[in-house]
């Protein structure tokens, strides 16, 4: 079994829990990946798992189909924030150029996958922009979304994507924390940073992880307890 872009075995979901295989291959780029596979290809300086797969296909001299090229391009623009994150390097842009030369339509990918939102997504974003808090002494943007609000708009967790990045866009903020209450009462946390703050290290305090500037975690602590710990460690 091959696991892609899953920082921990828990992130592989029901498939990883319920299906057994003689060997597991772990292909990923997250800094916090503990290399849980029997075979591990964890390249932490890579912009995305898509870039790792792209380089493997090139090395093996396999032919790229247009559907494969499109999937790799989508993964690339998603994990680099449409080439806005610090993980973008020369090789990243060369990969994008090569995929576009194969026939990938950048405008179609960005318009239909990155810039296309549901009613619920826009409502969740509106709630975040209306209610987020800012802690100037730590330059932290913070927002908590309870399950009742999600039920009100019939929103799914996918409809909350982008909130943690949006509240980070406040010009005085250096780091953002987005907490979301799940149906079972657990708190799902997401963190982002602009500059020197290592949010992977902070997320690890709750058993989570990810990247230097983007990380996540789940916790049974209250939102106030989580916020207090985060503020102490920024």
Residue ranges of model-derived segments:
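Residue-level marker of motif borders
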Residues: 23, 74, 202-204
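Short, well-ordered alpha-helical microsegments
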Residues: 10-12, 50, 199
């Amino acid at each position: 079994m091959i696991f892609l872009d899953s920082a921990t075995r828990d992130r592989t979901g029901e498939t990883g829990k319920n299906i057994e295989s003689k060997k597991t291959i772990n292909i990923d780029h997250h800094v916090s990946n503990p290399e849980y596979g029997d075979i591990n290809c964890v390249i932490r300086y890579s912009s995305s798992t898509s870039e790792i797969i792209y380089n493997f296909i090139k090395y093996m001299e396999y032919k790229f189909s247009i559907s494969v090229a499109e999937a790799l391009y989508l993964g690339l623009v998603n994990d680099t924030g449409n080439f806005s994150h610090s993980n973008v390097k020369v090789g990243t842009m060369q990969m994008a150029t090569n995929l576009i030369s194969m026939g990938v339509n950048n405008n179609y990918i960005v318009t239909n996958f990155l810039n296309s939102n549901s009613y619920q997504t826009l409502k969740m974003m509106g709630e975040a922009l209306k209610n987020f808090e800012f802690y100037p002494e730590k330059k932290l943007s913070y927002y908590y979304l309870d399950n009742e609000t999600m039920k009100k708009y019939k929103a799914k967790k996918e409809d909350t994507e982008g909130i943690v990045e949006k509240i980070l866009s406040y010009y005085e903020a250096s780091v953002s924390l987005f907490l979301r209450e799940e149906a079972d009462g657990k708190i799902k946390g997401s963190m982002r940073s602009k500059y020197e703050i290592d949010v992977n290290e902070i997320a690890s305090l709750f058993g989570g992880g990810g990247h230097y500037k983007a990380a996540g975690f789940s916790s049974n602590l209250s939102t106030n307890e989580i916020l207090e710990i985060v503020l102490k460690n920024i």
